[in-house]
């Protein structure tokens, strides 16, 4: 990270667009990647257009790092806003080479002119474009075209990068090829990003913060893990509910092929290729892969058993209970979810505040980092 991160991104957009009503207000840190997530047609792209100045709603407000882009007296037009915009499909100039497309939006004086600017060579390296510079867009694959579009947006030296479902037009294999490039940008650049998607797997891999939308409304905005573990929100009650946790690689056991990860509230063992100690890793733990025990189990095939406290609970239908766990002695660590039957809940006589043990049957690493699952055997 080379620059001091902007303080916040705030938006307030309300109004009717034909038969669609938008009621979106949010404030998120202007650092890292903020996912804008919800089902198709909920208003995600409309919010992005409002941030970009492509859609003007009376009474709207928008400021980034204290700079007002829209209020009662101000409305900056799109070309006046320091943004980069990446659309669902790359809009490249067909008569220009990849190099010329990349440099098209760069400020005069060269892409490296401004202090703290993202340099041309850096963008080429981050996005793996060096072998494509002399090609025409018609000779690129869909994934290559989108990487060029991202590079062009970065070289415009934006203060905020807006990405409107940039992978939605690509097949799953191509998506999996591009996601590591986006993660590399996230790790190396301080540029804040608003990333629109209706694909939760993209959000789980990329986002630090989340704006959750449904039917034109912002349901909540905040850190990804907080929204994932809030039983009042649909992410936590979904059948495939999971929580993402950022961890640090601590050691590697080459005999058993197991990586020890340190997270807030304990340590986990995960099958993995060798990695260097100190490397950051994002893991995903599904609610269905966590079971509960009153006492520490002995002689079990489950590798990961951590002390935890029940933070809160919520019924899920007539026969299940969603349990929000806080890891570590005293429950001061990371949050996880567990989904148990009401019979198990009653038999264990559980209640909020109880201390117990979380048996974690499955831990998934992000795919590009050597995806693996730690099974119960």
Swiss-Prot record:
Database matches in Pfam families: ABC_tran, TOBE
Keyword presence, Translocase: yes
PROSITE patterns noted in UniProt: ABC_TRANSPORTER_1 (PS00211), ABC_TRANSPORTER_2 (PS50893), MODC (PS51241), MOP (PS51866)
InterPro entries: AAA+_ATPase (IPR003593), ABC_transporter-like_ATP-bd (IPR003439), ABC_transporter-like_CS (IPR017871), Mo/tungstate-bd_C_term_dom (IPR008995), ModC_ABC_ATP-bd (IPR011868), Molybdenum_import_ModC (IPR050334), Mop_domain (IPR004606), P-loop_NTPase (IPR027417)
Keywords of this entry: ATP-binding, Cell inner membrane, Cell membrane, Membrane, Molybdenum, Nucleotide-binding, Translocase, Transport
Cystine pairs: none
Protein name: Molybdenum import ATP-binding protein ModC
Mop domain mapped to chain residues: 299-369
Residues annotated as domain ABC transporter: 4-240
Membrane topology term: Peripheral membrane protein
Assigned protein family: Belongs to the ABC transporter superfamily. Molybdate importer (TC 3.A.1.8) family.
Organism: Rhodopseudomonas palustris (strain HaA2)
Protein localization: Cell inner membrane
GO cellular component terms listed in the entry, alphabetical order: plasma membrane
């Amino acid at each position: 990270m080379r620059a001091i991160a902007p303080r916040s991104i705030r938006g307030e957009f309300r109004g009717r667009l034909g038969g669609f009503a938008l009621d979106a207000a949010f404030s998120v840190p202007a650092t890292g990647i903020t996912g804008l997530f919800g089902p198709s047609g909920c208003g995600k792209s409309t919010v992005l257009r409002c941030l970009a100045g492509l859609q003007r709603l009376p009474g709207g407000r928008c400021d980034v790092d204290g700079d007002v882009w829209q209020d009662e007296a101000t409305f900056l037009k799109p070309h006046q806003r320091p943004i980069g915009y990446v659309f669902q499909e790359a809009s490249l100039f067909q008569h220009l080479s990849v190099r010329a497309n990349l440099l098209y939006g760069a400020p005069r004086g060269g892409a490296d002119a401004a202090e703290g600017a993202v340099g041309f060579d850096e963008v080429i390296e981050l996005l793996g474009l060096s072998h494509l510079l002399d090609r025409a867009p018609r000779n690129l694959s869909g994934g290559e075209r989108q990487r060029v579009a991202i590079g062009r947006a970065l070289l415009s030296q934006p203060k905020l990068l807006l990405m409107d479902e940039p992978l939605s037009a690509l097949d799953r294999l191509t998506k999996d090829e591009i996601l590591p490039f986006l993660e590399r940008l996230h790790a190396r650049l301080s540029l804040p990003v608003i990333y629109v998607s209706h694909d939760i797997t993209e959000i789980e891999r990329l986002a630090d913060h989340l704006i959750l939308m449904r039917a034109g409304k912002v349901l909540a905005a905040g850190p990804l893990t907080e929204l994932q573990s809030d039983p009042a929100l649909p992410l936590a009650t979904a059948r495939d509910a999971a929580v993402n946790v950022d961890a640090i690689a601590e050691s590697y056991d080459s005999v058993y092929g197991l990586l020890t990860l340190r997270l807030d509230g304990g340590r986990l063992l995960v099958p993995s290729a060798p990695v260097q100690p100190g490397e950051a890793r994002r893991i995903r733990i599904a609610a269905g892969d966590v079971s509960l025990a009153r006492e520490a189990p002995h002689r079990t095939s489950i590798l990961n058993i951590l002390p935890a406290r029940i933070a809160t609970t919520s019924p899920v239908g007539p026969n299940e209970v969603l349990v929000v766990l806080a890891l570590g002695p005293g429950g001061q660590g990371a949050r996880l979810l567990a989904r148990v039957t009401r019979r198990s809940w009653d038999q264990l006589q559980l209640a909020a505040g109880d201390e117990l043990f979380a048996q974690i049957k499955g831990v998934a690493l992000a795919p590009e980092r050597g995806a693996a699952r730690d099974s119960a055997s």
